[in-house]
From Swiss-Prot:
GO terms for biological process: positive regulation of transcription by RNA polymerase II; regulation of transcription by RNA polymerase II. It comes from Oryza sativa subsp. japonica (Rice). Its main location: nucleus. It is found in: Nucleus. This is MADS-box transcription factor 56.
Amino acid sequence: MVRGRTELKRIENPTSRQVTFSKRRNGLLKKAFELSVLCDAEVALIVFSPRGRLYEFASAPSLQKTIDRYKAYTKDHVNNKTIQQDIQQVKDDTLGLAKKLEALDESRRKILGENLEGFSIEELRGLEMKLEKSLHKIRLKKTELLEQQIAKLKEKERTLLKDNENLRGKHRNLEAAALVANHMTTTTAPAAWPRDVPMTSSTAGAADAMDVETDLYIGLPGTERSSNRSETG
């Protein structure tokens, strides 16, 4: 009769779990000892109980010696393994880049129309469609750049027109200020007889008319003025 396979799981009962731990621990230590003796192997075993108690076995003079040997071994082999993996990764990357460069060079030759002897009609049509799509994208980009340049030129034109209008306004203000200053100068200056006009009888009268003497009289109207006239007469 074949025994069924027992499912391994944690023993819930603490007493049963402790009894099982003691039995299995002793059996494991015995197996480790037998392996070291029968096969002349260096064996080290470390076990912590559920309560944290340490159990250990070492076929070497000390457990630490076996642990140090393990550390040195893993350090050397892990480093060598890592180096080998890095070298292989570099080789794979180099091979991948070489394939990509070859594909790009092939595409470049197709675009330039080189080495087309072995192409079929379908391949040439496909290449033509790709070129047309590329040209369409190039034209769109070119149109976009031209529109941007035109927009910048229009903005610059608006700025220049605005600056020109401001300068015209300042010029008009300066002309108006000059006219006002000139008018004030001509109206407030005293009248003078022109030097280049000859003095004649008519012009002398005009000159006398320009020289007017004013007197101040105090008294009743006509009194002082008449007496002065009689004296002068």
